[in-house]
Amino acid sequence: MSIYNPKSLKAEEFINHEEILETIEYAEKNKRNVELIDSILNKARPQKTEHGVHCEGLTHREASVLLACDIPEKVEEMYKLANEIKQAFYGNRIVMFAPLYLSNYCVNGCVYCPYHMKNKHIKRIKLTQDQIRDEVIALQDMGHKRLAIEAGEDPVHNSIEYILESIKTIYSIQHKNGAIRRVNVNIAATTVENYRKLKEAGIGTYILFQETYNKESYLELHPTGPKHDYDYHTEAMDRAMEGGIDDVGLGVLFGLEGYQYEFAGLMMHAEHLEAVHGVGPHTISVPRVKHADDIDPEAFDNSLADDIFEKIAACIRIAVPYTGMIISTRESQEVREKMLHLGVSQISGASRTSVGGYTEEERPHDSEQFDVSDQRTLDEVVNWLMELGYIPSFCTACYREGRTGDRFMSLCKTGQIQNCCHPNALMTLCEYLVDYASEDTKKIGFELIEKELNKIPNAKAQQIARDNVDAIKSSNRRDFRF
């Protein structure tokens, strides 16, 4: 029997099955222990310091107790705390991005994904570089600046060379005032050498969903293909960081396994990255199993109700206060709105989850990875966020100013990142409004920018931001940043 060790590089030790089961038992035993719950909540509260703000975060056991808690007033207190922590680290900014699917060729047999190799219904597509150019121009014409590229695992069709060439193509395209300034990458677990190549290509965050942390379930859900190797997949983030990638993104596909198990495993993975590399996950994604071609979410026994889903989001924010939390267009407008109040800091907008989908007038369903619930345009999403009091941010400055990895975390964990992110969000929002927004969205947006500029505490920084906003409005000058 292996022993739990967050500093180990062996998957069975840093994601330890026995420790997860003991954690779930401990949480169940203490789910109405008010004294313990209060002490956990107090530990997690933001504390002001001479350098800004400090948040302790929680261990996987402490976080699991909060998740298990079913005392209504304590759950409400958790939700308020999650929002308070989100405000302390990220303010009212919401980072915008879009996925770009390059290829749905795949050699794996994942039973929850329509790209699995046995699916004969789905239309297999791999974009050429010219087609990628067309997709990127379509995304730029919406106003997007940040992409997450996606591809199935196929060493022939989707080689690392193809991925690298695609990244180079994406960064090279500047259409009108458009530009993609950050490319995040969501591809299969690979080698240290290949992660070095991705680093050299200038990627932002490397994202890899664990799918499930339960090894027995994992092997059943991935019966064939290279992804069947649980250890290789689970240890991928360590290889990525060894390869020089500063920012990594975690996530599980909720609904495949019991949510208590997945939550504990996710928290342990975050603790492991902190223990070994001194840097926790840059992002955590919270997708749920959704309907797609050849996939019925009702076939899985662990589907997640909205109230549990919301509670998970709040507990992640409280436990890992510095992480960027992502929710995609898998979820409806109503669910996404609730999640914004519980700690989500990044959302996708106007997403197409099919290969080549952005250049199609009609949403192509025959190559989608999952059905999109929120089908609004980017302008509608931006308008909606501003009506709710949020600042839609298209900023990518940290990545290009070297604020990544431990440098980003040192600023984020003290709340000092707001000194850069707040004005940068306003300037990139101004770019969006001038270049892409509808008249109604412009009106709301410029009023919001003026109100938010007045909140910048440093007089010099406020004046620089004002001057830059004026320059964006009156010229084609773009890409100002702190």
Question: How should these model regions be labeled?
Answer:
Residues M1-G52, E337-L342, S351-F482:
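Radical SAM enzyme core and accessory elements
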Residues T49-I94:
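An N-cap/entry alpha-helix motif that binds or orients negatively charged groups
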Residues Y90-G91, V95-Q131:
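Canonical Radical SAM [4Fe-4S] cluster-binding loop centered on the CxxxCxxC motif
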Residues A98, V136, L164-Y171, Y195, ...:
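Generic structural signal for well-ordered alpha-helices
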Residues M117-D134, A138-A240, D246-L256, G278-S285, ...:
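Core AdoMet radical
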Residues A151, T205, D231-I295, L304-E334, ...:
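Conserved C-terminal portion of the radical SAM core fold
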Residues L221-K227, E298-N302, S367:
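Short glycine-enriched, charge-decorated loop/helix-capping segments at active-site entrances
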